[in-house]
Curated annotation (Swiss-Prot):
A GO term from the CC aspect: cell projection
Disulfide bond positions: C347-C358, C352-C369, C371-C380, C534-C564, C569-C580, C574-C590, C592-C601, C788-C799, C793-C808, C810-C819, C987-C1014
Designated gene of the protein: Egflam
Effect of inactivating the gene: No morphological abnormalities. Knockout mice are viable and fertile. However, the terminal of bipolar cells do not appose to the synapse terminals in the rod photoreceptor ribbon synapses. The signal transmission from the rod photoreceptor to the rod bipolar cells is less sensitive and is delayed compared to the wild type mouse. The signal transmission from cone photoreceptors to the cone bipolar cells is also impaired. These mice show reduced visual function. Impaired stability and postsynaptic targeting of GPR179.
Name of the protein: Pikachurin
Originating species: Mus musculus (Mouse)
PTM: O-glycosylated; contains chondroitin sulfate and heparan sulfate.
Length: 1017
């Protein structure tokens, strides 16, 4: 017996026991103290599986209420089986009670009532109310994040970053969880960190020399996404490889050095122990402890215990400290000031704002709050886009330790100094200059390059001093004990370290512009001050380092870093829709839209032969001519181009929701064709490098996952994409010569730089991409130096580039090299016969749209007669069909293919092809008659006799709406489905339809191209 039945029986017995004349049952119930129903009940669906309910305390609650019960059941179900209850205890002095009922079915209606309980039993039920949980599609979890990118930092650390998936589901993403697996050891995934509220992190405590894969899940209010595609397998560094330095400010160590320490090397203390007093979030897995650092969290050393919190109302007393004046910084109009705030207390007592961290300042006493990399402003609350870092004397940026540099390295740095002293570079075995290290510092405007292989310091000093406010380039080179410093391509200065050790152990990050422990580096580097000024470029061992914050660039962390180009565009005046972009720390360019050029996009021009320049960040874009499904299994590009540099993207398109892409690049002088069907990348590379400054013909194609590449007359290269997928879908434009954002390209696309050079022809699946009509967007695309740019073709003729030269396609009525001669009915008016005999040159055609002509090349019957001569084995004589052709489109054609004369037609149910073999390309006149009656066809050529054929299927009518072409047609390969690749090379003297309808070839034509007079040449 349930609770309700028990109370019902109790009150029924009470009523029956009353003597005659006693009060009524209702009065008895009231006097018994039965509690009334809860009041003001409110219901609301929370999600797919839960609803919320709220009510007020009943009015008549003479006895104290000890609890409530919520009764709920699915509407329309068997109540005795489906009704469920949920008990709710009473809080102290609570007039309004709220509760959440979960574990429900999505999109289901529920009936809900509430009853209160007192010491005397259950009160009366509230009036039933209804609520419906949200439908399933309203409660979707996020899509799986994109495949994470992993960077190995050391033998026990990796840096991880990822991007959200295609959609965030039915609610915003709240957090991520990160998992790992060791493919060589583990069979299941291990969770490292849950509820991570950023898209990058650093994982510490990994096993050295071990393979790892990482995956990410996203979570919103409705649950977790599927696991992302696992990262590529990475291997942590081995003990003999680059040092195991930590990452970011958390790498700062307890100095353990008193202020009177002489900084000399202690042979017993060469291996520094790195310790963090304030531990990062950690998760224990077995006996292994993994610590996690996010890019948004910075930690001080053990003496500098950072408190990353907002200042309280009892604000700290800020002390004015006498700091030596620094030269005026070159800031843009809207640059963000870097506020490194100095306090008169240690980090143990200092409170720093969010996005900042505390470091004890041993030089001036007290402590400083430093802004994290990418943050600035007085409260470190402003975002800073860093490309050319600016340093203020207390700033620094960290990169991964120098790799493969223990024996030799080369570093090139371009900088502009605003103060005479400061540390530019440091990397070593310890944070404080003990043991092995290398450094570059400014000391009284001279550059000091120092390194120590473990038995003595080499000091190499530039012979000339730098000029403050001017740009300088310095190159450092070391091989074993020997070092070299070269400033501004001047005479190199050399030196040698002491002792016999010739290798350097690099464990710390590579610091640029300063170091968190610069105070302790004075003995090693010669200065305890940070650099003041800007850095424009940094190269290590011949590779340019992207100084943007990771994961876009290689900068792992930093403090109080500004952007040198900030405000550079404030005074720029880019017109005609141009936008400003910094290309150096102190200069900008205008990104001019198509059709404009110049310093400020002030010059309008007609784009003819596009010229792309890497220095101008050029690119153009054109949509795919047809829907993506037309290119799923087959794509072919023919490109004629002239490269001016050995690297750059020629063409690129991709799919935003998958791994699909295709790209054509210049790479080290070769052409690379890359494509991915979603299961692996295929890479085809030309056998020989291309000659720069010359025109080249390129053809690439892919059928399913098989690719072909051919450049000029080089050997054809074939290759195959990995995996089992065979289709490519690209939903973006086709980008030519560059892309708008190089951070968004697929990682295996090989796209690194814009193309420098010219492109004069692009044909996609036989369809020409026209520069004037098909380019829809782009920036800084100019005209190449080419004859077509000068519009040499007169009378409306169009210039067709042919590498260094050109050809003119002349309109009907004009001929000559530049369409300068008027012809047609007037050019040879002394020879009447010549007017009627047009000459075709392979890219010529005549077009007819007269209804009296068209009706004779359609319907149930057709009869055509021609007299022609030609010197080519291939060429189209006649064509009428749908444009563009579709599968089983109606058409009728007559032409030469490989020397044979072929009459073809399709009535909608299959193609009929009737062939006559012979020597028809002998330059002599030939007569051909093609007749069709329903499905049956016949062709007669000279005296060769008739050949007959029949089209398959049941269709008997030729239904066509297009024009009639004679001698060729526009984009012939495209519109004939590659049945013909060129027009007639020769002449046509007679053309008759329906046995007696004679057509004047030139006079009756509505349009034509490249028609000369037969016999004139």
């Amino acid at each position: 017996m349930d609770l309700i039945s028990t109370f019902s029986l109790h009150f029924l017995l009470l009523a029956c026991s009353l003597p005659p004349g006693a009060v009524s049952l209702r009065t008895a119930l009231r006097k018994s103290g039965k509690v009334g129903p809860p009041l003001d009940i409110k219901l609301g669906a929370l999600n797919c599986t839960a609803f919320s309910i709220q009510w007020k305390t009943p009015k008549r609650s003479g006895s104290s209420i000890i609890g409530y019960t919520v009764f709920y059941s699915e509407v329309g179900s068997d109540k005795s089986l489906r009704e469920r209850s949920h008990n709710v205890p009473v809080g102290q002095d609570t007039l309004i009670t709220e509760e959440v009922i979960g574990d429900l079915k999505p999109g289901t209606e529920y009936q809900v009532s509430v009853a209160a309980y007192s010491q005397t039993g259950k009160g009366r039920l509230s009036f039933p109310r209804h609520v419906t949980t949200l439908s399933q599609d309203s409660c979707l979890p996020p899509a799986a994040p994109q495949q994470p990118h992993v960077l190995v930092v050391s033998d026990s650390e990796v840096a991880l970053s990822w991007r959200p998936g295609e959609n965030e589901g039915s609610a915003p993403i709240q957090s991520y969880s990160v998992e790992f697996i060791r493919p060589d050891f583990d069979k299941s995934w291990t969770i490292i960190q849950e509820r991570l509220q950023m898209d990058s992190m650093v994982i510490k405590g990994l096993d050295p020399d071990t393979n790892y894969q990482f995956a990410v899940k996203a979570m919103n209010a409705h649950g977790f996404s599927p696991r992302s595609w696992p990262s590529n397998t990475v291997r942590t560094l081995g003990p003999g490889e680059a040092g195991s330095g930590h990452y970011g400010p958390g790498y700062i160590t307890n100095p353990g050095v008193s202020e009177d320490d002489d900084g000399s090397e202690d042979e017993l203390d060469l291996d520094v122990s790195f310790e963090e007093v304030k531990p990062l979030p950690a998760t224990k897995v077995g006996n292994k402890k993994f610590s996690v650092e996010s890019k948004k969290t910075s930690v001080s050393n053990s003496v500098m215990g950072s408190r990353l919190a907002q200042p309280t109302s009892a604000s700290l007393h800020e002390t004015t400290v006498a700091i030596p004046p620094t030269p005026a910084q070159r800031k843009g109009k809207n640059s963000v000031a870097m506020m490194s705030r100095l306090f008169d207390m240690s980090c143990d007592e200092t409170l720093c704002s969010a996005d900042s961290f505390c470091v004890n300042d041993y030089a001036w006493g007290g402590s400083r709050c430093h802004c994290n990399l990418g943050k600035g402003g007085e409260a470190c609350s402003e975002d800073i886009f860093i490309q050319y870092p600016q340093f203020f004397g207390h700033s620094y940026v960290t990169f991964e330790p120098l790799k493969n540099s223990y024996q030799a390295f080369q570093v090139t740095l371009e900088f502009r100094a605003e103060a005479e002293d400061g540390l530019l570079l440091y990397c070593g075995e310890s944070e404080h200059g003990r043991g092995d290290f290398m450094s570059l510092a400014l000391i009284r405007r001279s550059l000091h390059f120092r390194f120590n292989c473990g038995t003595g310091i080499a000091i190499i000093i530039s012979e000339t001093k730098i000029k403050l406010g001017a740009w300088h380039t310095v190159t450092l080179y070391r091989d074993g004990l020997n070092g070299m410093l070269q400033l501004n391509n001047g005479t190199p200065v050399t030196g040698q370290s002491q002792g016999q050790y010739s290798k350097i152990t690099f464990r710390t990050p590579l610091y640029l512009g300063g170091a968190p422990s610069a105070y302790w580096l004075v003995r090693a580097t010669g200065t305890n001050r940070g650099f003041q000024g800007c850095v424009q470029s940094l190269s290590v061992n011949g590779k340019k380092i992207d100084m943007r914050p990771w994961p876009l660039g290689k900068a792992l962390n930093g403090a109080d870093v500004g952007e040198c180009s900030s405000g550079i565009c404030d005074e720029a005046s880019c017109i005609h829709g141009g936008t400003c972009a910094a290309i150096k720390a102190d200069s900008y360019i205008c990104l001019c839209p198509l059709g404009f050029r110049g310093r400020h996009c002030e010059d309008a021009f007609a784009l003819t032969i596009p010229q792309f320049r890497e220095s101008l960040r050029s690119y153009a874009a054109t949509p795919w001519p047809l829907e993506p499904q037309h290119y799923l299994s087959f794509t072919e590009f023919e490109i004629t181009f002239r490269p001016d540099s050995g690297d750059g993207v020629l063409l690129y398109s991709y799919d935003t929701g998958s791994k699909d892409f295709l790209s054509i690049n210049m790479a080290a002088g070769h052409v690379e064709f890359r494509f991915d069907c979603g299961s692996g990348t295929g890479v085809l590379r030309s056998e020989a490098p291309l000659t720069l400054g010359q025109w080249h013909d390129l053809r690439v194609s892919r059928t399913a996952k098989n690719g072909i590449l051919q450049v000029d007359k080089q050997k054809v290269v074939e290759g195959m994409a990995e995996g089992g997928f065979t289709q490519i879908k690209c939903n973006t434009d086709i980008f030519i010569g560059g892309v708008p954002n190089y951070d968004d390209v697929k990682k295996n696309s090989g796209i690194l730089h814009p193309f420098s050079g010219s492109i004069q022809k692009i044909i996609l699946n036989d369809r020409t991409i026209h520069v004037k009509h098909d380019f829809t967007s782009g920036v800084n695309v100019e005209n190449a130096a080419h004859p077509c740019v000068g519009a040499p073709c007169a009378h409306g003729g169009s210039c067709r580039p042919r590498k260094e030269g050109y050809e003119c396609d002349c309109p009907l009525g004009f001929e000559g090299l530049n369409c300068q001669k008027e012809c047609g009915n007037h050019c040879l008016n002394t020879i009447i016969e010549a007017i009627e005999i047009p000459q075709f040159i392979g890219r010529s055609y005549l077009t007819y749209d007269n209804p009296n002509i068209l009706k004779r090349v359609s319907g149930s019957r057709s009869n055509a007669f021609m007299r022609f001569k030609t010197t080519a084995k291939d060429g189209l004589l006649l064509w009428r069909g749908d444009s563009p052709m579709r599968p089983n489109s109606d058409f009728i054609s007559l032409g030469l293919r490989d020397g044979a004369l072929i009459f073809s037609y399709n009535l909608g149910s299959g193609v009929a092809s009737i062939m006559v073999n012979g020597s028809f390309s002998d330059g002599r006149w030939h007569r051909v008659k093609a007749v069709r009656d329903g499905q049956s066809g016949k062709i007669t050529v000279d005296d060769y006799g008739a050949r007959t054929g029949k089209s398959p299927g049941l269709m008997r009518q030729l239904n066509i709406n297009g024009a009639l072409y004679v001698g060729g047609m526009k984009e012939i390969a495209l519109h004939t489905n590659r049945q013909y690749l060129r027009g007639l090379v020769g002449c046509i003297s007679h053309f008759t339809l329906s046995t007696d309808y004679h057509i004047s070839l030139v006079e009756d034509a509505v349009d034509g191209k490249n028609i000369n007079t037969c016999g004139a040449k």
